[in-house]
Amino acid sequence: VQPIGADPRKVTRDMTEVYGVGAFLAAGCQIYKMAVDTEADYIKIWPDKKTMQGNPLSGWVIYANENVSDDFWKKYDHIYVPEKGTTVKISDYARTLYIRTHWSTFNPAEGVYGWDTDEKLKKVIQGALDRGMRLSFRVIVDSRDRKNEATPAYVFDAGAKYYTDNGKRSPYPDDPIFQEKYAKFIEAFAQKYNNPDLVEFIDGYGLGKWGEAHTMKYIDPKNRETVFNWIIDLYLNCLLYTSDAADE
């Protein structure tokens, strides 16, 4: 083991010990150093398979929306694990609450926001924060395979074009009225949640069925690239802490 980029002819034994041990400590491993009667030091390592490191953008998340049961957090605070013969608290293992829910939940009426008015949404978010967890979000606008319309009614009332599936409306993402209303919402969303102390990541897309881009429908399929660039730029300009990957 030697410092990265160092000339091997100039590396001393002390330098090797300091840099070598420091590198493996940073990796979160248990270390045993064995000195021998040579100029080199040998390091044996064993992976730490028990400690939860909590590295950014890694580890376990809990999926949720505003419709979780009233005892949601009570259940997750007491999950029985047969191998342990006891219960565990899920927030000791999962560091992030991942909320994937409708635009209409976050923004039921123009200028009205669910993080202020929706008691169930507020409760599930506060439960995560009370347990020292972080937040992540996906905003879904497509109503296909949904119990309720995912886009707020005021968007369609303003004239946004849409298609229907099973009696529910979904907006065309290349419609200018949809884009105007959605951009206004994301700006408000950013004012509330563009905070790295609370938020782990925000999906920088959310269009399409389940918020997945490979299911998209357009007024004109030729607008596909334009829509992609529009929504990515919108999230990047409003939210510094986004996960901008899309299923496309």
Which residues does each predicted region cover?
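Boundary/entry segment of secreted carbohydrate-active catalytic domains
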Residues: 41-95, 100
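Aromatic-lined substrate-binding rim segments of carbohydrate-active enzymes
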Residues: 91-94, 98-158
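An active-site-proximal structural segment forming one wall of the substrate-binding cleft
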Residues: 124-129, 167-201, 227, 231-234
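A solvent-exposed, charged loop/short amphipathic helix patch at secondary-structure junctions
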Residues: 155-172
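Conserved small/polar residues in nucleotide/adenosyl-binding loops
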Residues: 241-248
